[in-house]
Amino acid sequence: LRSAAVDVGVDLRLGVAVTGVAEHPDGVTAHTDTGSHTARWLVAAEGASSPIRKALGISFVDQGFDQDWLVLDVRLRRPVPTLSPFVQQICDPARPVTYVVGHGDYRRWEFQLQPGETRDEMVADARVWELLEPWLTPDDAELVRAVVYRFHATVADSMRASRVFLAGDAAHQMPPFLGQGLCSGIRDAANLAWKLQLVDDGIADDVLLDTYGSERLPHAAGVVAHAVDTGRLIDELSGRAPASTDLDAAYGGGRPFPILEHGIRVGDHSAVGRQVPQPTIDGRPLDDLLGSGFAVVVDGDGLVDAATARWGDLASIVVVPAGTMPLALPPGGAVIVRPDRYVAAVAHDAAEFAASSDALLHQLGIRRATPERTTT
C-alpha cells in the first residue's frame, strides 16, 4: 500500500504526530511535531483513538459491544494438512475461537479472553503455544505477532466538521466477525474522493460534501449492527449467553447487507444503491471499462447520443452488446454507475434516462456536463 501511494505521488510522512488543526477561509492547516501543512481539505483517518476527532468534539454512538480478544498471527514453517483451508468460527463453550486463512503461509487465530485474564499473561509465549496446541506446535510455525485487542462497536455522530472529514476507524469501529472493518474504511475513501475532486475542480458545489456523512453513516451503522449481532450469536452458540429470540436474523436470514439508502441516487429499482457486480465483457473485467469516474453502461448503442449529451466528459459511456450484460440492465436501457461503483440509476428507455440523469446532475449541483467524451 505504501509503494502504491508513493507511485501516484502521495507524500508519506511516517511517525509524525498531529498536534493541532486550524481552519481558515481557503483551507485547513495541520500542525505537527515536525512542521505545518496546509491544504483545502483534511481527512482524519488516524485510527480509533483519532486525536483530530477528539479535538473537534465529535462524539461516538456506542452500540454496547466490548470484548477483549487475543489475536495471534503465525507463519507456517511447513505444510500442516490438518489445518482447514477455510475461515472458521469455533463456538467452543470453553473459549470461542476464530481461525483465519491469510495470504500465503500466514494464519491467524483469535481467542476470546475469559474474565480475569490479563493482556500480559495472554501474550506470553508459553500461554500462546498452549492455546495453539490443538492446531500446531512451534515446529510447525513461527509466531509473528501476539496482541490483545478490545473489539468495539461505535459510530461517530458526524463525519464532517467544515473542511475536516473523518474516515476509517476514526469514524466507526466494529468487531471483526464480518471482516468489514477495512472494507468500511475503503468505502469511506471511495465515497469521499470523487466528491472532493468535483468540488475542488469547481464542477460541484461544496454542499455535495455533506452527502459523505449522510450516505456513509447509516451504511456504517448498519454494518456495525450486523457485526455485533454476529458476535452475540457466537456467544449464544457457545452457550456463553442466553439464546436470542431472533436467531434467524442473527444467522442472516431475511437480513440483506446494507445498501446505499439515501443520497446521490434516483429511483426505486432493486439495483439502485447496490454496488455494481464485476462481470466480464468481451474478455475484460467491467471495472477496466468503467474508468475512474461516473459511467453510463448502455445496452446496445440506442442511448449513446443521449448519454453523451447529458453526461459529456463527466462519465465514460460503455456500450455492451444488446442482451449480453449480466447486470440489472434493461434491454435498450442504461445503468448509471457512480465513481465508487454504486448503481445511481437504472433507466428502461430514453425518457427515463433523461429524467434520471437530470435528477442526478441536480443532486450533484451540476446543470449539464461538457459534451466531449469518448465511448468504449
What are these regions, as identified by a protein language model?
Residues 1-242, 318, 370-376:
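Core Rossmann-like FAD-binding/catalytic domain of the broad FAD-dependent monooxygenase superfamily
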Residues 2-9, 130, 198-376:
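Helical substrate-recognition/capping region of FAD-dependent monooxygenase/halogenase enzymes
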